[in-house]
Amino acid sequence: MLRHHIQLSFHRLFAFCVSRRYFMFKRGLNMTETRESTTAKLCSFARAYHSNTGRQKIFDDYLAYDLMGKEEYEEIGQLIENDFESEQLSINYSFSSKRIIEKLNRYIAPIPLSRIAFAENKLLEFAQKHGKCQYVVCGAGMDTFAFRNGNPDIHVFELDHPNTGRYKRERVKQLEWNIPDNLTFVPIDFSTDNMTQALLDAGFQPDVPSFFAILGVSYYLTLPVFAQTIGEISGLCTADSQIVFDYPDETTLSGSGAERVHTLAEITEKLGEKMMHGYSFREISETLERYSYEIEDHETPQMIERQYFENRTDGITAFENIHFILADRRESA
């Protein structure tokens, strides 16, 4: 019964990942494609813009612009310029960098740039230690790691809705990119599919060291659902495995929270994606302990500031409420 309950919660998480990041619309020969949601496109835009224009690069996602495409890039630039009011977008207008840079650097760029830098650095350390390993990207969307990856020993599994995978593969085809041999798209229909079985059917090997990334998701989940998600991953992974994620702390929606934290919450709610309250470090620590994980690295906002934003001249600073976690799965007693 508990296993079934955890599985359902994991389904809710990934169904959420899909619904948060994507929506259906009519276009093209098949009349249905899947596009990223606005907040996910904001993150893609931040990586693309930073890689194209940033002088002090926090993270160089040099393929983000190509995969996103000029049309969507311009659309999101306009959205930021127009204070996140989508009704004012125009296909005949290009956004002004001068008009978006302050809002982009203050509200949008800090979290996605620093968390992907943290996650991929930890992944590379994991791969260096273990050699052959598996990287599971939960709700991969327009993630580009598999196409930037130069290590053939890292096998990438991208979990997403079937329509999402088709849309991404179509973009890759349009760009004439080759799909690497060590990339596997894992389609998940959560009304019918079991995540564990889908991964196993796709070639996931439980006895191979595995690294799971769940980025940008905890903001929108209650602690019980997120906790049960950790439990499901723990049941799938071997002892030589790690999980990485980011989370907002308990100050997120409190009266004492920073101004821009509240502003970002207002922006995401305006875009139809309401943030939940944050978690305390104690809650996170106890949750991981319950499912045989031990925290290897906890990056506080102050540590993130020193690691990624110190001495910058562009005004990008770490968010006051965001933490990064890397956890090891240990052998059960």
Where are the regions a protein language model picked out?
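Short amphipathic alpha-helix with an adjacent loop that forms part of the alpha/beta core around
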Residues: 195-206
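Rossmann-like AdoMet
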Residues: 24-136, 142-186
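Rossmann-like AdoMet/SAM-dependent catalytic core
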Residues: 38, 256-333
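Conserved acidic residues
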Residues: 189-194
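A conserved beta-strand element that flanks and buttresses the S-adenosyl-L-methionine
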Residues: 213
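Conserved beta-strand signature within the Rossmann-like core of class I S-adenosyl-L-methionine
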Residues: 237-248
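A short, conserved alpha-helix within the catalytic core of class I
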Residues: 221-232
